[in-house]
Swiss-Prot record:
It comes from the Eukaryota. It is found in: Cytoplasmic vesicle. It comes from Mus musculus (Mouse). This is Gametogenetin-binding protein 2. One of its GO terms (biological process) is cell differentiation. InterPro entries: GGNBP2 (IPR026073). Interacts with isoform 1 of GGN. May be involved in spermatogenesis. Induction: By dioxin (2,3,7,8-Tetrachlorodibenzo-p-dioxin).
Length: 696
């Protein structure tokens, strides 16, 4: 706490105030010098945080001497602006403004190491400015006490005033230890000045006391006579009943009208003890019938006057100390902010920008983690799709070799059949007269399907090109062992030791009749071409010339196979845009017999009559097309070896086919009926098939 070290006498306008000394105005007749000790602002004896101090020293060294001098200057506007925002008490704000104005006028080093210039500029001393450790202690040790000090001040809930600036403070209160506290903080000079009582002031206190307790006229006169004896106006020897021991320790100066009270603490405590009942409260009628009783009443009034004076000094000291601390901490806080802003300008980045950058970095890290998770999920889905539909197993060299083999096979087949046409892609469908299905291994690179199904030959395609009669509760057929696949030309069949009879028909739009299987396969092939390779719809195979060859193959006994009588139905594909024709026929030479092929061989084959006729009078040896197709269906459960995963994969990849399945069937039915009506006069079997199809 601040101490009272000196007294400003009247006429001493230019008192030599030292560092951290300010004047304390008690009343019109008393002004003391208030001093703050050095231990209040010890800049060297604090234990500082090593890491923070090191960082502050680094920031301090970044500033040049000129930049540091500019940073360590703040205006009164900045200080008073912070004052209005932080301090709610009106009395405190006025006191700080008054003290700052006094320091601007006087220029006293009251806030050292802070200095106040004549233009209202607050700055720091050169020694503190250049010492980084002292500056750190000032800014971050003492400067951090501002908010704590303001919060610790008790305030009134009504007007937000503190207790020191409240109106209730001026009311007399019971005696306490405050007078002893302020008495110990005074120097001897200040104590002598405090106990120097003015006679006029004591008389005012005495008159107030007499009115308060309603003294009668005689008693009042007795008290006034005792007061006059104290100030030396009356001779005490002439007064009857006067007790000189009561005025012991009191000395008067009649010329200066002063009363000097003994400075001993015990004597002061004795005088204040007389005044204690007065401050306890209550009014009562008092009497002073004798001079000695009147002397005691005068001593009581002297104690009251002395207590009020000490209480006023204590109040002024507390208020001025609080004002000085507020101004000092406000100045330190303003200088700290100015220093930090200057450092931020030098660094080129502010704390707010650093905070935003940290938030942005956290956001980028979070987005990167989410992107990694999305990439992992995408990779898992991609791997799953790759497992369902693996990559092609054939390299470019293998495909080239396969194309060469297919070309050689087509040429050999056409030469074997004696056909004069070019060796284009064709498929031979062998329909037996009994319950035998086509046993034709399909080419490995027929449609470029990369999947090899379980239980199939390595050369067969894993993609199912047939269709089921319903979406639910049925499985799609496979090309292997399928008559429809044989008629469509996407299967291969070549039994051991058998040569395929391959024929080719030129594409002619209006060229007579065509065979039933060729026309149907052409329609089906064109429909599937829309979904996969977008082939032209108008490429249908006209087989008028092929009908004659078919008839020759049927009637000529030399074209029959040795194992039984078979009918060769040849389907010819259209020419594609590709320069290399894709072969849908391949032979299985030198390989192990496949399961489905062995099953085909195990099916009993029955011979049919040597000559077949499509006429109505052909007899029992002639079978209709419906019977041939019905007999060609395989009913063995051993051939159903397509897995459920393959079925689901095929259904997922051919959704458009299933959605338009009914349209395809209706379109095929209309085309076939139209064909039968046009060729009814040539082939009676078409009439029978049309009747059967219409009934169905």
């Amino acid at each position: 706490m601040a101490r009272l070290v000196a007294v400003c006498r009247d006429g001493e306008e230019e008192f030599p105030f030292e560092r951290r000394q300010i004047p304390l105005y008690i009343d019109d007749t008393l002004t003391m010098v208030m001093e703050f000790p050095d231990n209040v602002l010890n800049l060297d004896g604090h234990q500082n945080n090593g890491a923070q101090l090191k960082q502050f020293i680094q920031r301090h060294s970044m500033l040049k001497q000129q930049d540091l001098s500019i940073a360590m200057v703040v205006t009164s506007r900045e200080v008073l602006s912070a004052l209005s925002q932080l301090v709610p008490c009106v009395g405190c704000r006025r006191s700080v403004e008054r003290l700052f104005s006094q320091l601007v006028e006087s220029g006293n080093p009251a806030l050292e190491p802070l200095t106040v210039g004549p233009k209202g500029v607050l700055s720091l001393t050169r020694s503190c400015m250049t010492d980084a450790k002292k500056l750190y202690t000032l800014f971050y040790v003492h400067g951090s006490k501002l908010n704590d000090m303001i919060d610790a001040i008790p305030k009134s809930k009504k007007n937000k005033r503190c207790q020191l600036h409240s109106l209730d403070t001026h009311k007399p209160k019971p005696l306490g230890g405050c007078w002893m506290d302020v008495w110990e903080l005074m120097s001897q000079e200040c104590r002598d000045e405090v106990v120097l009582i003015d006679s006029s002031c004591l008389l005012e206190t005495l008159e107030t006391y007499l009115r308060k307790h309603r003294f009668c006229t005689d008693c009042k006169n007795k008290v006034l006579r005792a007061y006059n004896i104290l100030i030396g106006e009356l001779d005490c020897s002439k007064e009857k009943g006067y007790c000189a021991a009561l005025y012991e320790g009191l000395r008067c100066c009649p010329h200066e009208r002063h009363i000097h009270v003994c400075c001993e603490t015990d004597f002061i405590a004795h005088l204040l003890g007389r005044a204690e009942p007065e401050f306890a409260g209550g009014r009562r009628e008092r009497h002073a019938k004798t001079i000695d009783i009147a002397q005691e009443e005068v001593l009581t009034c002297l104690g009251i006057h002395l207590y009020e004076r000490l209480h006023r000094i204590w109040q002024k000291l507390r208020a001025e100390e609080q004002t000085w601390q507020m101004l000092f901490y406000l100045g330190v806080d303003a200088l700290r902010k100015s220093f930090e802003m200057t450092v931020e300008k030098v660094q080129g980045i502010s704390r707010l920008e650093q905070l935003c950058e940290e938030f942005s970095e956290e956001e980028r890290v979070r987005e990167l983690k989410q992107e990694k998770k999305r990439q992992k999920r995408k990779n898992r889905r991609k791997n799953k799709c790759v497992c369902d539909t693996p990559a092609s197993l054939h390299t470019a060299d293998e495909k080239a070799v396969s194309r060469e083999k297919e070309t050689d096979f087509i040429e050999n087949s056409c030469n074997a059949c004696g056909s004069a046409e070019d060796g284009e892609t064709c498929v031979e469908v062998m329909v037996t007269s009994e319950n035998t299905s086509c046993t034709c291994p399909s080419s490995g690179n027929l449609l470029g399907s990369p999947k090899i199904k379980k239980g199939m030959s390595p050369h067969c395609n894993g993609s199912d090109c047939g269709y089921s009669s319903s979406m639910e509760g049925s499985e799609t057929g496979s090309r292997e062992g399928s008559d429809v696949a044989c008629t469509e030309g996407i299967c291969n069949h070549d039994e051991h030791g058998e040569d395929s009879c391959v024929h080719h028909c030129e594409d002619k739009e209006d060229d007579g009749d065509s065979c039933v299987e060729c026309w149907a396969n052409s329609e089906e092939n064109n429909i599937k071409g829309k979904n996969k390779k977008k082939k032209k719809k108008s490429k249908m195979l006209k087989c008028d010339e092929h009908i004659q060859k078919l008839g020759s193959c049927i009637t000529d006994p030399g074209n029959r196979e040795t194992s039984g009588n078979t009918m060769h139905t040849v389907f010819h594909r259209d020419k594609t845009k590709d320069a290399h024709p894709e072969s849908c026929c391949s032979t299985e030479k030198g390989g192990q017999p496949l399961p489905w092929f062995e099953h085909r061989k195990s099916v009993p084959q029955f011979t049919e009559p040597t000559e077949m006729s499509f006429g109505p009078d052909s007899g029992k040896g002639a079978k209709s097309l419906v019977e041939l197709l019905d007999e060609s269906e395989c009913t063995s459960d051993e051939e159903i070896f397509i897995s459920q995963d393959e079925i689901q994969s095929f259904m997922a990849n051919n959704q458009s086919f299933y959605s338009n399945r009914e349209q395809y069937r209706q379109h095929l039915k209309e085309k076939f009926n139209k064909y039968c009506r046009l060729n009814d006069h040539k082939r009676p079997v078409c009439s029978g098939w049309l009747t059967t199809a219409g009934a169905n």
